[in-house]
């Protein structure tokens, strides 16, 4: 009897804990913890009753960079996880098959650690670009009632299709780390997925261009910076009579979005319009690096749904959906130095005694005693 009461008490406590866990998770992320399984629901486009069904929603067979491809199709599609009215999910394996009812497993962003370079960017840069695309792309539920003749529906359809195009471009290698477009060369372009006769072509391209510009600006650093410290340009600080100083001008128009720090002490920064003034009262002993860090940089978090296989035509199509915003610290780099000159002095004397004479040289950052030699000469470097 005591044992039965104890079991009931434990059950009640566990039920309460589980209930609290359910309520605590409402509204925090789009999906549950990593490892959850869910089914794919694919919505064909155009929908029945769409008056813009002109036969231009599909495309011919396409072969993309890095072995990715698409079979010839007469329609298009969107998809969601869990139901036909679930949050939208986007394909990340062009050409790999997928059907409604296919079951995929949720993974976090570590999924991209297992992806190699696509020849343009690394797996990690693919992850970052997709998160930034989702920041400006369509994030919401889909609906089987969408019709392209309805303006609101057409807007959501166009936004979603443009988002998918940019994600595909990132996957196959048509976008670099700064989100600039790279020509596919002899391969088909992802944009060939959309015929110019598509009833939403103009709207899709408007979103495509706007989102592309937004992602590029999202990652743009001041023009005097590079994204790699190894390739950073070296600028020179010059003495102005009271301090060592230089002024850097940003032609990218993003200076106000960045804060600056140096890997040595004693460096002061100030902004004036599109100009950054860097100064020091004491000359640095060696070249140093300045880091520009974007303030309040965020992007969408990524949820990956996968069958554990990632290669063209292998297994079931993997997809990504969105979660809450995460930090996205975009950084740029620039280097600084002070060029030191040398001073050569020749001692003269009526009595000819010019060697072994000591002098003390003082000045900004200099306090040194030297001794003449070799005909009254000394050089201070």
Which residues are covered by each model-predicted region?
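Bacterial Sec-dependent N-terminal signal peptides
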Residues: 1-13
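Gram-negative bacterial Sec-dependent N-terminal signal peptides
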Residues: 10-24
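Sec-dependent signal peptide cleavage junction
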Residues: 20-40
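Acidic/charged, solvent-exposed loop-and-adjacent secondary-structure segments enriched in E/D, K/R, S/T
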Residues: 175-339
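Structural motif
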Residues: 345-355
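Short, acidic Ser/Thr/Gly-rich low-complexity loop/linker segments typical of extracellular
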Residues: 365-381
């Amino acid at each position: 009897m005591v044992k039965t009461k104890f079991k009931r008490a434990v059950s009640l406590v566990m039920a309460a804990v589980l209930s609290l866990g359910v309520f605590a998770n409402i509204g925090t992320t789009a999906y549950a913890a990593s490892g959850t399984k869910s089914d794919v629901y694919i919505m064909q486009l155009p929908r029945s009753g769409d008056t813009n069904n002109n036969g231009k929603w599909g495309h011919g067979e396409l072969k993309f960079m890095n072995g990715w491809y698409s079979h010839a199709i007469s329609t298009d599609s969107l998809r969601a996880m869990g139901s036909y009215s679930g949050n939208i999910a986007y394909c990340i394996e062009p050409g790999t098959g997928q059907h409604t009812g296919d079951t995929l497993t949720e993974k976090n962003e570590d999924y991209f650690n297992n992806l190699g370079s696509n020849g343009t960017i690394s797996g990690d840069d693919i992850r970052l670009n997709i998160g930034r695309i989702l920041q400006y792309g369509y994030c919401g539920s889909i609906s089987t009632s969408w019709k392209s003749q309805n303006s609101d529906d057409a807007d959501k359809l166009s936004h979603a299709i443009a988002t998918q195009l940019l994600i595909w471009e990132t996957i196959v290698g048509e976008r670099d780390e700064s989100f600039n477009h790279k020509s596919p060369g002899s391969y088909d372009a992802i944009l060939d997925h959309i015929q110019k006769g598509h009833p939403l072509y103009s709207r899709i391209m408007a979103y495509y261009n706007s989102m592309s510009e937004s992602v590029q600006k999202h990652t743009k650093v001041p023009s005097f910076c590079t994204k790699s410290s190894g390739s950073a340009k070296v600028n020179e600080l010059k003495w102005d009579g009271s301090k060592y100083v230089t002024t850097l001008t940003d032609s990218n128009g993003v200076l106000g979005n960045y804060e600056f720090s140096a890997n040595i002490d004693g460096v002061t920064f100030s902004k004036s319009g599109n100009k950054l003034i860097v100064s020091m009262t004491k000359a640095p002993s060696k070249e140093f690096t300045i880091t520009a860090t974007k303030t309040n940089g965020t992007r969408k978090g990524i949820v990956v749904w996968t069958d554990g296989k990632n290669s063209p035509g292998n297994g079931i199509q993997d997809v990504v959906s969105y979660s809450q915003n995460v930090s996205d610290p975009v950084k740029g780099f620039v280097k600084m130095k002070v060029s030191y000159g040398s001073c050569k002095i020749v001692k003269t004397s009526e009595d000819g005694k010019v060697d072994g004479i000591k002098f003390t040289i003082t000045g900004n950052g200099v306090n040194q005693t030297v001794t003449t030699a070799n005909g009254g000469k000394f050089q201070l470097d």
